[in-house]
Curated annotation (Swiss-Prot):
GO BP, sorted A to Z: rRNA processing
Keywords carried by this UniProt record: Cytoplasm, Endonuclease, Hydrolase, Metal-binding, Nuclease, Ribosome biogenesis, rRNA processing, Zinc
Listed EC numbers: 3.1.-.-
One of the record's GO cellular component terms: cytoplasm
EC top class, as a word: hydrolase
Signal peptide (from-to): none
GO molecular function, one term: zinc ion binding
Name of this protein: Endoribonuclease YbeY
Cofactor binding comment, as recorded: Binds 1 zinc ion.
Role summary: Single strand-specific metallo-endoribonuclease involved in late-stage 70S ribosome quality control and in maturation of the 3' terminus of the 16S rRNA.
Cofactor(s) needed for function: Zn(2+)
Species per Swiss-Prot/TrEMBL record: Lachnospira eligens (strain ATCC 27750 / DSM 3376 / VPI C15-48 / C15-B4)
PANTHER family: ENDORIBONUCLEASE YBEY, CHLOROPLASTIC
Amino acid sequence: MTINIEYEAEEKLDLDYEKIITDVVNEAVDYEKCPYEAEVNVTIVDSESIHEINKEYRNIDSPTDVLSFPGVNYVTPSDFDAIEDELENNAEDYFNPDTGELLLGDIVLCVQKIKEQADKYGHSEKRELAFLTAHSMMHLFGYDHMTPEESAVMEAKQNEVLERLGITR
């Protein structure tokens, strides 16, 4: 498992963000029973940078807390059996040629939103960072929250990942 973490924001988080991100990513991969060694890229940026990325990729002209860019197109969330042929027949599109790891995708986190939302929701910055990472990992596994049913499934999964790590409000 490779987790590449880049911290590009000037404003710092006063916590061990690398450990928190690594623990959550590893737990999510284990929880979703990913059958491959995997790679995830995580970048921590400021509000201005995530605003630009959000505008460019989602046509939303405002900053956000986290953006997810899945590397795999699932038929059904986290159903690797359903896409096994696609992965094997197009390995160059899905696997890192140097490591052989499945490219699960990219996560972009906003440092200011982590701080603001931790304060707003009355919990620690550690919990907010862990929550946003778990949320984004579920997107990398193909889950979404466009309907109430999808939201309920995704929320239960991300909360279970956090509970397994002992990270609570």
